[in-house]
Amino acid sequence: MEIEQRRIMKREGEEEEDNNQLSLQEEEPDTEEEMSGRTIEPWTKQITVRGVFVSIVIGVVFSVIAQKLNLTTGIVPNLNSSAALLAFVFVQTWTKILKKSGFVAKPFTRQENTMIQTSAVACYGIAVGGGFASYLLGLNHKTYVLSGVNLEGNSPKSVKEPGLGWMTAYLFVVCFIGLFVLIPLRKVMIVDLKLTYPSGLATAVLINGFHTQGDAQAKKQVRGFMKYFSFSFLWGFFQWFFSGIEDCGFAQFPTFGLKAWKQTFFFDFSMTFVGAGMICSHLVNLSLLLGAILSYGLMWPLLDKLKGSWFPDNLDEHNMKSIYGYKVFLSVALILGDGLYTFVKILFVTIANVNARLKNKPNDLDDVGHKKQRKDLKEDENFLRDKIPMWFAVSGYLTFAAVSTVVVPLIFPQLKWYYVIVAYIFAPSLAFCNAYGAGLTDINMAYNYGKIGLFVIAAVTGRENGVVAGLAGCGLIKSVVSVSCILMQDFKTAHYTMTSPKAMFASQMIGTVVGCIVTPLSFFLFYKAFDIGNPNGEFKAPYALIYRNMAILGVQGFSALPLHCLQMCYGFFGFAVLVNVVRDLTPAKIGRFMPLPTAMAVPFLVGAYFAIDMCVGTLIVFVWEKMNRKKAEFMVPAVASGLICGEGLWTLPAAVLALAGVKPPICMKFLAS
């Protein structure tokens, strides 16, 4: 997934966000009284058989959904709240069925809910960040051809076709090591520094709410989820009958006319993206639409008129020296400008905050902590009760680092063992910086650390092996930094729901194991059934091409760019930095309207249609909030989850039918009269 999911959905005005972080901690007085009066079960009883089963089911379903979203657009919304909601729905339904059948069912606690959510998110998180639509897919032959077979730096030897065996092995050796990096610092970051981790805290508040709000509201959420899940699934089934061959069906409906359709401006009736638009913030969705208008509405039609002047008119439309090169590298410039600025900003915030703490300067979070000291002490006591030994963390990290140093070069001979060792020497400090920054700002910078590693490794390895080494090394660094950050966010959730850290760590391990097995299988379900990486098809996988061309830039430098593309890249890079500066330095009423450059970059390659889908979702939420804000607040996650899961689940039978050679019977197409 490529867009940093936690990041693009949380940056709608940092002043508002800071207030929200503090208000989250001041909510639910009844919840805390109830929790303080209840005996917390030992960590071994917080992990249940039914909890593991439900987490696997949710994790598998979400892995398929995330894989589809990744391979189509690269935009995957944060599904943590959906996972918590589904866990509550499944287990509550299970419990009620057992009770009506005369069986005794164990009460469903917030700790078990937290465990299920953690495990499911760990599972689908590998589908989001495992590189199946970016750095790993960027190694295949199709992406090599799209990048330009005659392009300097794009060596014919830099190809590795996807394989179930090597992909599964790669995931197992790079994903687990991140779980051990920051375990020794959990007390420092959660208890001593009191970092907020807004995503983890928000999930905890949601889970606490499920278990205290009463049956009436929970029933409404369940009914809303089931209603829209059924509608979305049946709609996907209905659409399938009319999608006989390429460019057929409702997904190609020329909503705004055939001229607009040729420039990808149409509504494709995707309930998945409508649901994703309901979860993503208005700023994200409008940034996507702005990027679509800027690219397919203005730039690409203008550049197309320069065919024969700026680039030869006899080139294939997907040749990197034609207009396609501008699409790829301008989107790369936006992403790098946004990422570099955010990286420097978070680094500065982290250093400034550490310096302030060393000087014992009070801050707002400390004041909140003093006001709720009794509650905090109860949470801290529970959080510190089940200690994870230091020797366990150190031995786990060293063991997986040693295994990875041996296995990764066997999978990718171009990535030498000493590069792996150097990466793991720096990984703990990078992981700490990233996790600390995420605790303050809720921005997970793992992808940016990965991109830096990609450029460095690609540059030092050389032309023949640089692309493969850079892409593989990118995954190595990104996985360690990302997994450790997500675990720390989950520790924050555990702290607030009074769940044992040992139970959380075990849940992460379970989810990671399942994810390492399920994610490659779900990827190959799509890879075998659909035309993955086709720029004109549904599954464009834009980030595979973006990452490969980043590696080529690292190897070759700017000679890989088409005519005048470098100057345009400077402009877009500067625009990305400028937008961020304006957002941070101007008042919130101005800064909150600044677009997100990374979100703007996605339609450059994918097209405008999915941005329109997302904006339909944001329009639904906007109108709903105007009509009944209170109802919208607790129903939007349920309805959006239903829309995403319904059509997402239909993908499974659709893929099976495609593998079996069963084609839709009707082709619905629209032609000019």
Curated annotation (Swiss-Prot):
Record membrane topology: Multi-pass membrane protein
Example GO biological process: iron ion transport
Gene Ontology terms: cellular component: plasma membrane
Region (Disordered): 1-39
Residue spans crossing the bilayer: 46-66, 71-91, 119-139, 163-183, 225-245, 260-280, 283-303, 328-348, 392-412, 420-440, 442-462, 467-487, 510-530, 558-578, 604-624, 642-662
Induction (UniProt): Slight induction by manganese, copper or zinc deficiency. Inhibited upon iron deficiency and induced by iron overload.
Keywords tagged on the record: Ion transport, Iron, Iron transport, Membrane, Transmembrane, Transmembrane helix, Transport
One of the record's GO molecular function terms: oligopeptide transmembrane transporter activity
Chief location bin: membrane
Basic and acidic residues biased stretches: 1-13
Disruption-associated phenotype: Plants do not show visible phenotype, but a decreased iron and nicotianamine content in seeds resulting in a transient defect in germination.
Pfam families found in the cross-reference section: OPT
Tissue-by-tissue expression: Low levels of expression in leaves and shoots, but not detected in roots. Restricted to the vasculature, in the xylem parenchyma surrounding xylem tubes. Expressed in pollen grains, in the vasculature of petals and sepals, in the carpel veins, in the style underneath the stigmatic papillae, in the vascular tissue of the funiculus and in the chalazal endosperm.
Compartment(s): Membrane
Composition bias type Acidic residues, residue spans: 14-34
Function: Involved in iron loading of the seeds. Acts probably as a transporter of iron- and metal-nicotianamine chelates.
Family from the record: Belongs to the YSL (TC 2.A.67.2) family.
Protein name: Metal-nicotianamine transporter YSL1
